[in-house]
Amino acid sequence: MTPLLRFLNRTSLVTQIVIGLLAGIALALLAPAIACDLAFLGKVFVSALKAVAPVLVFILVMASIANHRHGQETHIRPILWLYLLGTFAAAVVAVVASMLFPSHLVLSTGEATLSAPGGITEVMQNLVLSAVDNPVNALLNANFIGILTWAIGLGVALRHAGETTRTVVDDLSNGVTLIVRMVIRFAPLGIFGLVSSTLAQSGLNALLGYLHLLAVLIGCMLFVALVMNPLIVFWKIRRNPYPLTLLCLRESGITAFFTRSSAANIPVNLALSERLGLHEDTYSVSIPLGATINMAGAAITITVLTLAAVHTLGIPVDLPTAVLLSVVAAVCACGASGVAGGSLLLIPLACSLFGIPSEIAMQVVAVGFIIGVLQDSAETALNSSTDVLFTAAACLAEERRNP
């Protein structure tokens, strides 16, 4: 065995990712031209994750439900409530932070050509339409709502199939999981390419003009990740939540930060859930579900940028409106994965609460894209790490009640 292979076998994946991260930063600073060329490594890694994630979710959920035995508990309902509670709590934190540290934007005059949903009804309609999408189309376009719908439907139908059929489905699940593990082993190389090319191309100059807004956004996300989420987990498991919280941030949050895709991070979260010894019938459904509806980071982004526009325009905000904004942001965030452009394109919907015209709201969206290098990364890291955190908390709480 070569020294390189021995090193790779002895070193944990997280350590390899940190080495790739530091090497990427160093290369971007020392040789930006070479770093730009290495963007290919990052693109290949993210493309591989995005390619395998829809198939993984479809097969894994279908196999989990098809092979489910009567009497087994899956604990999905408490996890779903944790997802909704966490998203609403994040929106409340963002409202409070925006009131304490109001941000002011220099809104650009350029017209945006993006299209945003016209109301909460339209967001919910999009979710329903996504759920009844053609299964082949859902797999091709990574429509995870549609994939989950078909996987659950087929899984329920196959529960009445013969033992041989269920065994084949289970073997398919094991095969796809093996491929995913192979893809994840290339995470250090992928993150090396992503970090080096992003820093070399964008630099940090584009972010300097929006430091205050970024500080509020990132501060809210850190507060939710390190204070609010641990409080929710403590309420659930009744013991020190920080070992579990920090483990999820380290193992899931770091990769999500650089891939900037909750869907691409699903395989990472499933692998972490397996290592934690969680209930497979539970996490195989709750992790993909969390990637579509557990959007604490998106709730923060929508709330902070909307209130930044409100403060810039001098619009007064009373307490009932602030509470309503929290609810709207939480509902919008749950639908963010079903909207092209994610959380940023749902900002005009929240702005409509304050009578802000769409032209100005879309300028706020443009500001969001400018700071997206950090905002989108931090948002995805919070969203994705919370998926596995709340899943683990619910499973551990159930084990505590039924040892």
UniProtKB/Swiss-Prot annotation:
<keyword id="KW-0029">Amino-acid transport</keyword>
<feature type="transmembrane region" description="Helical">
    <location>
        <begin position="295"/>
        <end position="315"/>
    </location>
</feature>
<feature type="transmembrane region" description="Helical">
    <location>
        <begin position="214"/>
        <end position="234"/>
    </location>
</feature>
<keyword id="KW-0997">Cell inner membrane</keyword>
<dbReference type="Pfam" id="PF00375">
    <property type="entry name" value="SDF"/>
</dbReference>
<keyword id="KW-1003">Cell membrane</keyword>
<dbReference type="GO" id="GO:0032329">
    <property type="term" value="P:serine transport"/>
</dbReference>
<dbReference type="InterPro" id="IPR023025">
    <property type="entry name" value="Ser_Thr_transp_SstT"/>
</dbReference>
<feature type="transmembrane region" description="Helical">
    <location>
        <begin position="79"/>
        <end position="99"/>
    </location>
</feature>
<comment type="similarity">
    <text>Belongs to the dicarboxylate/amino acid:cation symporter (DAACS) (TC 2.A.23) family.</text>
</comment>
<keyword id="KW-0812">Transmembrane</keyword>
<comment type="function">
    <text>Involved in the import of serine and threonine into the cell, with the concomitant import of sodium (symport system).</text>
</comment>
<feature type="transmembrane region" description="Helical">
    <location>
        <begin position="175"/>
        <end position="195"/>
    </location>
</feature>
<dbReference type="GO" id="GO:0005295">
    <property type="term" value="F:neutral L-amino acid:sodium symporter activity"/>
</dbReference>
<feature type="transmembrane region" description="Helical">
    <location>
        <begin position="327"/>
        <end position="347"/>
    </location>
</feature>
<keyword id="KW-0472">Membrane</keyword>
<dbReference type="InterPro" id="IPR036458">
    <property type="entry name" value="Na:dicarbo_symporter_sf"/>
</dbReference>
<keyword id="KW-1133">Transmembrane helix</keyword>
<feature type="transmembrane region" description="Helical">
    <location>
        <begin position="14"/>
        <end position="34"/>
    </location>
</feature>
<feature type="transmembrane region" description="Helical">
    <location>
        <begin position="353"/>
        <end position="373"/>
    </location>
</feature>
<dbReference type="GO" id="GO:0015826">
    <property type="term" value="P:threonine transport"/>
</dbReference>
<keyword id="KW-0813">Transport</keyword>
<dbReference type="InterPro" id="IPR001991">
    <property type="entry name" value="Na-dicarboxylate_symporter"/>
</dbReference>
<keyword id="KW-0769">Symport</keyword>
<feature type="transmembrane region" description="Helical">
    <location>
        <begin position="138"/>
        <end position="158"/>
    </location>
</feature>
<dbReference type="GO" id="GO:0005886">
    <property type="term" value="C:plasma membrane"/>
</dbReference>
<feature type="transmembrane region" description="Helical">
    <location>
        <begin position="45"/>
        <end position="65"/>
    </location>
</feature>
<protein>
    <recommendedName>
        <fullName>Serine/threonine transporter SstT</fullName>
    </recommendedName>
</protein>
